Amino acid sequence: MKNQLRGPPARAHMSTSGAAAAGGTRAGSEPGAGSGSGAGTGAGAATGAGAMPCKSAEWLQEELEARGGASLLLLDCRPHELFESSHIETAINLAIPGLMLRRLRKGNLPIRSIIPNHADKERFATRCKAATVLLYDEATAEWQPEPGAPASVLGLLLQKLRDDGCQAYYLQGGFNKFQTEYSEHCETNVDSSSSPSSSPPTSVLGLGGLRISSDCSDGESDRELPSSATESDGSPVPSSQPAFPVQILPYLYLGCAKDSTNLDVLGKYGIKYILNVTPNLPNAFEHGGEFTYKQIPISDHWSQNLSQFFPEAISFIDEARSKKCGVLVHCLAGISRSVTVTVAYLMQKMNLSLNDAYDFVKRKKSNISPNFNFMGQLLDFERTLGLSSPCDNHASSEQLYFSTPTNHNLFPLNTLEST
């Protein structure tokens, strides 16, 4: 059994973003993605005046099959925690601290300096001019820079590499499209991170670990930059994510995509309801009749309005509770979208402020990291619920930093039985 939630599509910002639109459309499934071969050609490039050079997912698959990526230098421009969860084989992650974005825009930041791993840094230095350099973010499909529009991190890196004489392209459809079509060439490790833990940055709300600019930028232009930007300090989230879903309440579990496909885990915790907060991850046991599904088609991107789905998500979780079943709320890595829904549930059902609900979840799962604009939507939700919070002392900060992506962020609350 499955409930598919279909919301209004995300606003198109193809000059700065490749996020998949809401409404269930598969990320990166754009028409006309060409293919080709040859390390230095423009095979699969987008057409049209001013279009940025790209390669198709099919082209990359052929290169990996034929040469094992020997003639390629793959650069993953997504946030570190997404890279650790899953990435294309041989890829190097570019974790750009927010403060360095300004230097990158000014053109005085060597790309090599933002590669954290020494071996990867050397590999980049020796191969960037000889190999085809292919950059990818989460889901950029077709992209034409617009005069005066703010450049994405992907665009800044691509332009700098080409200015430096590199044969650089971006991957059409991004990681989402490639993983969907050629998952055999993706390395997945959603349970742990190989990077050392680091102290979370201090946020505007005082919420440790909040990704101030995961899907935005540094504080100056967080409304405009896309999901290819990194965390505010470029550091990885703590590597303490458990290899099983975390129990938030006796019936409510928070997890990742891998948890949703593990029958042993689902059976162990009595989970019969699964809330899938992604646009394209499949519901593994949908046709067996044993589980009840609801899918919220939202990407982890600044332009997405997750708050419009709060009432339905809360009702779904409560339905599981009323039937004395466990419910798993998951996204890809279990740190952003699913956390946002879980926090919203606690706020409404337990009358907790945003700070208190966030801290409640963080005590259970230390590596949570919702993107900044989802936090803005939770702040709107807090006001709608009439809850008090220390955040109320930061009214001016709300105006400066938060933007709800659509006009549908306010909604009549369902009459729900309190816990």
From Swiss-Prot:
Biased composition (Gly residues): 31-47
Residue stretches making up the Tyrosine-protein phosphatase domain: 244-387
Tissue expression: Strongly expressed in liver. Expressed at significantly higher levels in malignant hematopoietic cells than in corresponding non-malignant cells.
Enzyme class: hydrolase
Domain Rhodanese: 68-187
Biased composition (Low complexity): 10-29
GO biological process, one term: peptidyl-tyrosine dephosphorylation
Gene3D superfamilies assigned to the protein according to its UniProt record, in alphabetical order: Protein tyrosine phosphatase superfamily (3.90.190.10), Rhodanese-like domain (3.40.250.10)
Pfam families: DSPc, Rhodanese
Record: active site: C331
Function: Dual specificity protein phosphatase. Shows high activity towards MAPK1/ERK2. Also has lower activity towards MAPK14 and MAPK8. In arrested oocytes, plays a role in meiotic resumption. Promotes nuclear envelope breakdown and activation of the CDK1/Cyclin-B complex in oocytes, probably by dephosphorylating and inactivating the conventional protein kinase C (cPKC) isozyme PRKCB. May also inactivate PRKCA and/or PRKCG.
The protein's name in its UniProt record: Dual specificity protein phosphatase 7
Source taxonomy: Eukaryota, Metazoa, Chordata, Craniata, Vertebrata
Gene of this entry: DUSP7
